[in-house]
Regions:
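Structured C-terminal cap/extension of enzyme domains
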Residues: 226-273
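Alpha-helix-loop-beta-strand connector modules within alpha/beta enzyme cores
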Residues: 39, 67-90, 130, 185-195, ...
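Short, well-ordered coil/turn segments that N-cap beta-strands
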Residues: 15-18, 46-50, 86-90, 110-112, ...
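Glycine-rich, proline-tolerant flexible connector loops at the mouths of alpha/beta enzymes
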Residues: 23-29, 51-72, 239-249
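Catalytic alpha/beta core domains of metabolic enzymes, predominantly
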Residues: 134-239
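Glycine-rich anion/phosphate-binding loops
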Residues: 26-38, 70-74, 214-222
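N-terminal amphipathic alpha-helix/helix-capping segment at the start of soluble metabolic enzymes
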Residues: 2-20, 273
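Catalytic beta/alpha-barrel core
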Residues: 70-71, 88-99, 111-125, 136-147, ...
Length: 273
């Protein structure tokens, strides 16, 4: 990186408006392709850069019997087709160094952004392995971390081609998260990296349904408007055509039909902030 991510800046960060969106987990080529096509068209309409996201393995599940995904090879082969057909960049999360090596060895052209999950954000070997690739790296801030604690994580990332950090809510008692906008403001003004706001995981209720996580997608639009007003220019949204029947994170995923209204609000507010 030309500058250490620990350098502090006072001026407003000026990054292109960007939205990362897609299903929680990749279920099929037809579904993911449909989501990517619709999301890209909406983002293009509103002058927003679009990146498609999906997980090949939801390793962090509340219960053993919950569906985890269709696997790395199946997912990333479909990513290649989605990239070719729709002309989009792609993001997926990794959970161990072997997965990073598999991606860079056999599926390097299929993935543009490697994401470090929130619960793994302090795993030094994993973070450094991702940063040693030619990929953009997005690190999700753990629900258990203070915003300024990201400084220690960023100190591990000097080799990264490009680095982002994501706010996805903070633990607030049992089975609950809260969004602390003062923390987002701190990261925007103290770290020389783009700060992404994950609005859909921020409304999650971890383990809130007993055997799975709950959530309330109704709060997503308002949180996006607030983040945009604060100056956030990078957003992460999980979207699905039928979230109530999705295999994971259904309660907090945005309905695909509601995606455009959220994008329009973000773009409108961003234009005047």
């Amino acid at each position: 990186m030309p500058h250490s991510p620990l350098l502090l800046i006072k001026e407003k960060q000026m990054y292109q408006l960007r939205i990362i969106a897609g299903p929680c987990q990749h279920e099929s080529l037809s579904q993911s392709s449909h989501i990517a096509e619709k999301c890209k068209a909406i983002c293009d309409k509103h002058g927003v850069e679009y990146i498609f996201k999906a997980s090949f393995d939801k390793a962090n599940r509340s219960s053993l019997g919950n569906k985890r995904g269709v696997g790395l090879a199946n997912t990333l082969n479909d990513f290649k087709l989605i990239k070719e057909v729709h002309g989009v960049k792609t993001l997926t999360d990794v959970h161990d160094i072997d997965q990073i090596e598999m991606i860079t060895t056999y599926f390097n052209e299929c993935v543009d952004v490697l994401q470090i999950p929130a619960f793994l954000c302090r795993q030094t070997d994993l973070v450094q392995a991702a940063c040693a690739t030619d990929k953009i790296v997005n690190i999700k801030k753990g629900q258990f971390l203070a915003p300024w604690d990201m400084k220690g994580i960023l100190s591990k990332c000097d080799e990264a081609k490009e680095l982002w950090i994501t706010e996805r809510g903070t633990s607030f008692g049992y089975n609950n998260l809260v969004v602390d906008f003062t923390g987002i403001d701190y990261m925007l003004n103290n770290f020389r990296v783009p700060v992404v706001f994950d609005a859909t995981h921020s409304v999650q209720k971890p383990g809130g349904l007993g055997g799975s996580s709950g959530g309330n997608r109704d709060y997503v639009p308002g949180l996006c408007r607030a983040a945009s007003a604060l100056g956030v220019t990078n957003f992460f949204l999980e979207v699905h055509p039928d979230p109530d029947n999705a295999p994971s994170d259904g309660p907090n995923m945005l309905r695909l039909d509601d995606f455009e209204s959220v994008v329009a609000d973000i773009a409108t507010i961003n234009a005047v902030v």
